[in-house]
Amino acid sequence: MRIAIEDLEVSLSGRTVVSGVHLVAAEGEIAGLVGPNGSGKSTVLRTVYRYLRPHAGRVLVGGADITSLTPAESARRVAALPQERGSDFELSVRAVVAMGRTPYKRAFAGEDRADAEIVAAALAGVGLAGAEKRRFSALSGGERQRVLLARALAQDPEVLVLDEPTNHLDVLHQVELLALLRAQRRTTLLSLHDLNAAASLCDRLHVLHGGSLVASGPPREVLTPELLAEVFGVRAAVVDHPLTGDPLIAFDHRTPAAGSPRAVAEEGAATAV
């Protein structure tokens, strides 16, 4: 199912935080939002899973304006892993994941065999097949993250919206998560701070800066040294990954990009001396 965000504008507390954003995620495509902190990534995602309502523009999912759908219709199309994640569920892991089946159930309807199989598959997919009876509130941050992803998968949506899905995960589970998302072949819109993970996972990247979209395209075309310097304020080389051939960003941690806050501060200090 295709996502289209058209001329999106979002205002919070009277301040425009996202303006004029237009992007598309084609059916089956993994589209990544990248940008510095405060660039508007989470705000854009929140309009897709209806946590925020646009001030102007619209979000189309499968050709329908997301705000025109009922909550159940929306939940059958879009499942989200937001940054606003509950951590105090006094429920078992399995019960939390089974919540993903709610959009398909009538009031007071019980779980059927198909539901049970979907929940089991979702737990297995995130490596938690043996954790069904554990209490969600007793889990580590990384384990909770994986349970909530399993809940989104159990929802069996057309579209996944994931806000920093690799947060709190160790390296092994990050790699497994990226492989799982690739294998899903499901339209996915996600934000990532790790630019190398974004370059490896995403079919297309959309770069946000100051609430505006400044670049879109395949990772190899978007993640240039010039853009990394201008948007992220870092000096870097982009090479081929020796194992996968994906773009690999090698950051220069010693020398700031010209014009970056660090470079300006160092230049000012040198001038003062």
Locate the predicted segments by residue.
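A short, proline-enriched helix->beta-strand linker immediately N-terminal to the Walker B motif
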Residues: 154-158
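Conserved ABC transporter NBD signature motif
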Residues: 57-65, 74
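Helix-to-loop junction immediately C-terminal to a conserved catalytic motif
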Residues: 49
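ABC ATPase nucleotide-binding domains
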Residues: 229-273
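Conserved structural motif at the start of ABC-family nucleotide-binding domains
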Residues: 3-5, 18-20
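The feature captures the beta-strand-to-loop junction immediately N-terminal to the Walker
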Residues: 34-36
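Catalytic Walker B motif of ABC-type/P-loop ATPase nucleotide-binding domains
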Residues: 160-164
